[in-house]
Amino acid sequence: MAKIKKRGESGAAKNYVTRNQALKKLQISLSDFRRLCILKGIYPREPLNKKRANKGSSAPASFYYHKDIQYLLHEPLLVKFREHKAFAKKLARAIGRQEWGLAKNLEDAKPVARLDHLVRERYPTFTLALQDLQDPLNLVHLFSTLPTNPIPGKTLVPSEVIAECSRLISEWKLWAIRTHSLRKMFLGIKGVYYECEVPGQGGEPVRVRWLEGFEFQQHVPHDVDFRILLTFLDLYRTMVGFVLFKLYTDENLVYPPPLDVELDEQGESVGAFKLVERKAAEGADGKTQVSKKAVRKAIKGIKAAGDDADVDMDEGAKETDEEEDEDFVERPSKAQEVDDVASAPLTTYNSLLATSSTPARQNLLFSPYTFYLSRETSSRTWEFVVRAMGGKVITSLTAPTPADAPNADSITHVIIDRPITVERMREMEAGRKWVWIQPQWVADCVNKQKIISSEGYGPGQLLPPHLSPWDGEGELYRPWLEEQGEKAAEGQEGEEEEEAAEQDEGESEDEEEDGKEEVAAEYPPALLAAAQNPSDASLLHAAELEAETNGVSHSAFRAQLKEATKVHAKKVPASQKEKKGEEDLRKIMMSNKKAKLYEKMQYSNREKAAEKEKLEKKRKAIEKRKAKEAKA
């Protein structure tokens, strides 16, 4: 006879433990348990049957996996938490006895918990760390902009933490400027979105996107729990430090980069740090030792440069061949390739280093230009963007007047974000040719990866719509904006023919709209909706309520509904009737629950289509009005 199982020793009661049971098992406080769970990535679970998991009790409780709590028992941070608890007791006793020397010694020997092992556990590979770098960068930047004054009723964020966050953000931007890895940016409501391309393991690029708030005074809300945020920040600071060390080491740079105190006191953020290359290791005989990593990186750079050169040569050969003879395409001989390789000079270590030090694909869009940032623009944002794209930045013209400044001759573009008169522009230029633009021009050039025309971006002009470069990742496609760009680039050719065609189309559209308006004026809107979809009970009920509000009798309402249904049926083509019949057959085969869900989906789709049509008509009306204003 089988042994009877005891209650609570198997199943959900064994797999799950409540939070109170976990606290007793770990012998720590609730605050330490929360901090430990955040650092280790453990979160509450939802059992299928809470009553069974709670051993028959129906009291509300938070549940965790039993294996997760067993895993926490071996965490080295538990020892640090207990040491900190003992330290707090000793420090409180010393302060109570006014033993200030002992209190200072205890403060100097305060136990500090290191989180390096947690970063290695949670991110075993460098690519995984890069894929999860968005939240750390967002939080680190948020704390770098917090005020250092006390928050009423809250714990003050230490100034050392804010300074370290500012340093990490500056080091990250400095690396992006050095490698020219900026790819996209967007000026949103919350702030400025950036996207960089970071080389991961094996040379595979990883896209890292983060958000930086605008430079406004931060008002910290009172309902924010800074203890939880600081716990996340401790982990994220360590993680960002790991990533930056790896990135700087791969670029043969010293990390952390040294800080110029004088420039830092002058208010320079990124420019206060100096990039210093690491010295090559020397052996006992004084010769330079070459590491395997440096050789692999140099070979990879040579391969990339060779591939680019081959592609360029192939494209050039194809273009010339197509111009001479489109039917014949000449291919290079394999024997010739072998002779070229055999006759080529041998590759030396110095040539390897020279090739690897200059990346094959650098994003140097603004390299020929020098930008002057006006006082009202955000120097932190636009200096980073311009320098990351290879350009030069001037933030101040040291002279009594801008025209007399010694560095004014090198300026090619002026970024200004306020209206300015033509006389003032000519006075500042003093005979020079400067391009006056608004900041959006820089962002649009970065997103399109090319220098676009500055027309329409002048000071005080109405800017074109600033679109998100990530629109293709799930949002609606808006082809008319591309059509506008093509029309602006090609010029206005054949305007008279287009105007005549537009007039004909407008007349036909007006006739169709007049016919629709006549039908709409004859019947109320709810009645028309019910006539278009007679099987929808909700639309029929809404039409009945509308008729009752208008004082129409039930018999008259039925007659109007029947007549409107007939009118709509005449306009419906045969293909739509067949489609409607197929949908009805599908609904017959559905269960009642699925049929209701299907009706809800169809209703939401109709609402979206109606809203889309409404916005489309509004857009066309605005375009027509703008075209008329431009002609006038």
UniProtKB/Swiss-Prot annotation:
Residues 576-585, 605-616 have a biased composition (Basic and acidic residues). Residues 306-341, 485-535, 565-585, 601-632 are annotated as: Disordered. SMART domains: BRCT. GO terms for molecular function: ribonucleoprotein complex binding; RNA binding. Residues 307-328, 492-516 have a biased composition (Acidic residues). Residues 361-459 form the BRCT domain. GO terms for cellular component: nucleoplasm; PeBoW complex; preribosome, large subunit precursor. InterPro entries: BRCT_dom, BRCT_dom_sf, PES. Its main location: nucleus. Keywords: Coiled coil, Nucleus, Ribosome biogenesis, rRNA processing. Residues 595-632 form a coiled coil. It is found in: Nucleus, Nucleolus; Nucleus, Nucleoplasm. One of its GO terms (biological process) is maturation of 5.8S rRNA from tricistronic rRNA transcript (SSU-rRNA, 5.8S rRNA, LSU-rRNA). PROSITE patterns: BRCT (PS50172). It comes from the Eukaryota. Residues 521-531 have a biased composition (Low complexity). Component of the NOP7 complex, composed of ERB1, NOP7 and YTM1. The complex is held together by ERB1, which interacts with NOP7 via its N-terminal domain and with YTM1 via a high-affinity interaction between the seven-bladed beta-propeller domains of the 2 proteins. The NOP7 complex associates with the 66S pre-ribosome. Component of the NOP7 complex, which is required for maturation of the 25S and 5.8S ribosomal RNAs and formation of the 60S ribosome. Belongs to the pescadillo family. This is Pescadillo homolog. The gene is NOP7.
